[in-house]
Amino acid sequence: MTKYVFVTGGVVSSLGKGIAAASLAAILESRGLKVTLLKLDPYINVDPGTMSPFQHGEVFVTEDGAETDLDLGHYERFISTKMRKANNFTTGQIYESVIRKERRGDYLGKTVQVIPHITNEIQAFIERGAASATCGEPDVAIVEIGGTVGDIESLPFLEAARQMSLRLGRNSACFVHLTLVPYIATAGELKTKPTQHSVQKLREIGISPHVLLCRADRRIPDDESKKISLFSNVPEDAVISVWDVDSIYKIPQMLHDQGLDRIICEELKLSPKDADLSMWSELVEKLENPKHEVTIGMVGKYVDLTESYKSLIEALRHASLHTSTKVNIEYIDSEEIETNGVDSLKHLDAVLVPGGFGRRGTEGKIAAIRYAREAKVPYLGICLGMQLAVIEFARDVVGLKQANSTEFDPDTPERVVALITEWYDREGKVETRTEDSDLGGTMRLGSQRCPIKPGTLAEEIYGKDVNERHRHRYEVNNRFVPQLESGGLIISARTPSEDLPEMMELPRSMHPWFVGVQFHPEFTSTPRDGHPLFKSFVEAALANKEARAGVQA
């Protein structure tokens, strides 16, 4: 029988509930337990797919094609269990499901209310999500409840968690509450009052936390922990300090050293083997002792909010671990390139253009791609970054001066990138879309396997085939591929069913390392294994740096 750990947050948002939940899951998995995680989001949107990156940050795509919260990316990076659509749900999905049932008459004429109908539906979604775990029936399901205690939006989720813990009985569920202990510089001390009030608010709802994770910019002294324990009615050893560190991969060891996994296992009456966190220790050791260093420029329009590129940033960090190379990422606003030119790129060892939507900033990205191609600087284009690389090549090499995407110019006569109208999903089902389709849930989503052209750089990196996740509406137009290939561009991977271009590259006679991919490889990178594409990219950046240093010498 699956047991549940509910993770809640108090005082303020963005304290790191997702990292804390993922770190706990990693420790429990290291003890031989099968673990899954769920994220409950209180917003009314059905999913984050149509939300602005400035509002929500990255949208993480699961293997089965769900657009989910970025915390699911942390979950997959910290444990071996893969996430699915059922691992993330929102208030919007809950209400949509309940209203559909009411319209069908499932409630037999009853008045449909938040309690019990909404709370029952939340519990059903939680249990369904746990049951769908890719690891089989999990021993523990960790349920992260988004938002902050006291928010109106979170109340139904907290009430559902309270009811569920009561229904399951003792030793079947426990609560971990993450809260802020701020340091007041003028007073020169940490303040515990916000934590006391947060726990009090939680207890008013009927939930008494078993563990407190106290976030601060420093380790919390024993005296303060005792005070928190006294006023919060939580045992002193269950008041756990979570201080700022320079790498999230240090968190599992930090929590284990303070006994979090022991407390959870005792509360849930679990008797697993001892934790083995040697993998995490080795990762941290590699992270802190690199042998090389490179600087990669990430050219985009969301560079002021790095949460928009969370998985991509982590994938580069994973590559740094597996190449013993410190990767410095410089975020470059593509609109500034449009105004000031490409001088800001000339010191870089490699250039990366990530995915994105909309016309704004695209000409700056194209200018960056042109610079990388002409200066022989390693280039990686992801999703939109591949499409723009094709547009730049079509304009500047093939001579199609009006080459563009119909996303940016619907009337362009040279539509080298255009809307996909029909494709197969990962299960072989035909999906269709038109210009008038809803934005939400109408992209090509999820993982798909496709063969790689022999003798290409793509084959060196991936082998015979590639299986990656997608999130896009537009695709390189096959009508222009013969002209692109006549100019030297190589389509190195295509979908087996629709023959859609998945990867492009330039031959080594034209460029040492120039690759574009229509998919999102960052979603499958983990600290354990890294990712072959990002490892190859970092190695190319290092080779470019060493070659330039040799020329200058």
From Swiss-Prot:
Sites where the protein binds ATP: 14-19, 71
Signal peptide span: none
Pfam family of the protein (one): CTP_synth_N
InterPro entries xrefs: Class_I_gatase-like, CTP_synthase, CTP_synthase_N, GATASE, GATase1_CTP_Synthase, P-loop_NTPase
Catalytic activity field: UTP + L-glutamine + ATP + H2O = CTP + L-glutamate + ADP + phosphate + 2 H(+); L-glutamine + H2O = L-glutamate + NH4(+); UTP + NH4(+) + ATP = CTP + ADP + phosphate + 2 H(+)
One of the protein's GO biological processes: pyrimidine nucleobase biosynthetic process
UniProt-listed Enzyme Commission number(s): 6.3.4.2
GO terms assigned for molecular function: ATP binding; CTP synthase activity; glutaminase activity; identical protein binding; metal ion binding
Region named Amidoligase domain: 1-270
Active site: 383, 520, 522
PROSITE patterns according to UniProt: GATASE_TYPE_1
Organism field: Burkholderia multivorans (strain ATCC 17616 / 249)
Binding site for CTP: 13, 151-153, 191-196, 227
GO annotations of cellular component type: cytosol
UniProt key word ATP-binding: yes
Protein name: CTP synthase
Family: Belongs to the CTP synthase family.
Residues annotated for L-glutamine binding in this entry: 356, 384-387, 407, 473
PANTHER family per the UniProt record, alphabetical: CTP SYNTHASE, CTP SYNTHASE-RELATED
Function: Catalyzes the ATP-dependent amination of UTP to CTP with either L-glutamine or ammonia as the source of nitrogen. Regulates intracellular CTP levels through interactions with the four ribonucleotide triphosphates.
Residue span, Glutamine amidotransferase type-1 domain: 295-547
Keyword Ligase on entry: yes
Domain of life per record: Bacteria
